[in-house]
UniProtKB/Swiss-Prot annotation:
HAMAP family: CytC_Ccs1
Segments passing through the bilayer: 14-34, 72-92, 162-182
GO biological process: cytochrome complex assembly
Protein name (record): Cytochrome c biogenesis protein CcsB
Sorted UniProt keywords: Cytochrome c-type biogenesis, Membrane, Thylakoid, Transmembrane, Transmembrane helix
This protein's GO CC annotations: plasma membrane-derived thylakoid membrane
One Pfam family this sequence matches: ResB
Role played: Required during biogenesis of c-type cytochromes (cytochrome c6 and cytochrome f) at the step of heme attachment.
Family according to the record: Belongs to the Ccs1/CcsB family.
Location(s), subcellular: Cellular thylakoid membrane
Subunit note: May interact with CcsA.
Length: 428
């Protein structure tokens, strides 16, 4: 029993909770540094050649579950521990503190007033109804009062005492929601060409719809660096009687029937070439060996003796580079310019077709996350409300009225209110 009590004391301590939060923050940071949820070969190939900090190779990354941190045993165990710590702290400290603050404290003697932050006393007439008058005044000022025969207990801002408990509940909901989301959330990356349609099905809400990419554009800085990707999507559904167009950008997702659609990436998927008066639409693939965001395709050109040429492009506005794979010498081809003669073939670029990279995510934990944030914000705000307490004691023998006050926050503001009340009571 003693061991269990000591264990609860340690788990419910602020130091223990802060240690867990720091550990979770470090683990989350590692999770952003190490790519998550790839196959084992990816980690072996990448981290065997260049171990993390010179220590963690691919095998150790897999063994320590750093390839899926947010669903790993040790990370989820840490979340559970933090939930237990917050719950234990709430039951051991916050709830008893709240219960204690609900009880009315009596100050029956003038000696106790000396322990208060603010005290004052006034002479009174023996026959006056001072207690009733003071009680009425305090109620008009918004104070909750409890009147005894010769003294009054009053308080204001008791809701501030609930704040820390609400924050703890919000954090627990956040942790539970995050753990729930790590197991239940699903995401899919999809590249769409303008005019292409994707079927959306959300089994959790039993809703179906079609989403069509109407238009995709890229905003660039003056130096050509991509600034923003914009997709205009048409949502349609006969069952839902729906037909509307919505726009998604980077950091501006679309939420639709429990699904969230993010603008994540882009690619150049196709080009339209005219080769010797015949139109061809060629599909491109990314070529990381050449550079970042470079797409290309290998084609045969030549009216008599055919040769292989590599076509590469890195911008939706062009140019298209045509390179001889024998010596990698090449020429640039621009949209709708005069045809370029390559190995006796006439080649012209008619169209560059970029595709929009979208991530469709279904995360049932989102309502929990939003609700937890509301609780945390609400709890933090009401925690700032000071809890003020007043005690008034009438001593008919010494013909003196004593008033004392206590505040847990904003003593300067309470001091002004205290002396103003004291002066009003003095004028009775």
């Amino acid at each position: 029993m003693i061991i269990f009590k000591n264990l609860i004391l340690k788990i419910s301590s602020l130091r223990f909770a802060i240690s867990l939060i720091i550990f979770i923050a470090i683990a989350s940071g590692i999770g952003t540094f190490i790519p998550q949820d790839n196959n084992n070969k990816f980690y072996i190939d990448n981290f065997d050649r260049a171990p993390i900090f010179g220590l963690l190779d691919g095998e150790k990354v897999l063994k320590l579950q750093l390839d899926h941190i947010y669903t790993s045993f040790w990370f989820l165990f840490t979340l559970i521990l933090l939930c237990i710590s917050l719950a234990a702290c709430s039951f051991r400290r916050q709830i008893p503190s709240l219960k204690a603050s609900l009880k009315w404290i009596e100050y029956k003697s003038e000696k106790k007033f000396s322990k208060l932050q603010l005290t004052r006393s006034h002479p009174i007439n023996q026959d006056g109804e001072h207690i009733s008058k003071v009680d009425l005044l305090l109620k008009k000022k918004g104070w909750k009062t409890y009147k005894f025969n010769s003294h009054i207990s009053a308080r204001k801002g008791l809701i501030g005492k609930i704040g820390p408990l609400v924050v703890h509940i919000g954090l627990i909901v956040l942790l539970i929601g995050s753990a729930y989301g790590s197991f239940t959330s699903q995401s899919k990356e999809q590249y769409l060409l303008p005019g292409e349609t994707l079927n959306l099905v959300n089994e959790s809400t039993n809703s179906r719809a079609n989403v069509k990419l109407v238009d995709f554009s890229i905003e660039r800085e003056s130096d050509g660096v991509p600034k923003q990707f914009i997709s205009k999507l048409n949502f349609s559904s006969e069952n839902l009687n729906l037909n509307e167009i919505k726009t998604t950008k980077v950091n501006h997702p679309i939420r639709f029937k429990g699904l969230t659609i993010y603008q994540a990436d882009w690619a150049i998927s196709n080009i339209v070439l005219e080769i010797d008066n015949i139109l061809y639409q060629l599909q491109l693939k990314e070529i990381p060996e050449i550079g970042n965001q470079v797409w290309g395709v290998l084609v045969e050109l030549g009216s008599e003796t055919k040769k292989n040429y590599l076509l590469t492009i890195d911008n939706e506005n062009g140019p298209l580079k045509i390179s001889n794979i024998e010596n990698f010498s090449g020429n640039n081809l621009y949209i709708n310019e005069d045809p370029l003669e390559v190995n006796s073939s006439k080649v012209s670029l008619k169209k560059i077709i970029p595709s929009s990279g979208l991530i469709i995510k279904n995360d049932p934990s989102i309502p929990f996350i939003y609700f937890s944030f509301i609780l945390i914000i609400f709890g933090t705000i009401i925690s700032l409300i000071p809890t003020n307490q007043l005690w008034i004691l009438v001593n008919k023998e010494s013909q003196k009225l004593s008033i004392g006050g206590l505040s847990n926050k904003n003593l300067v503001g309470f001091k002004k209110e205290f002396f103003k009340l004291s002066d009003e009571i003095k004028n009775f």
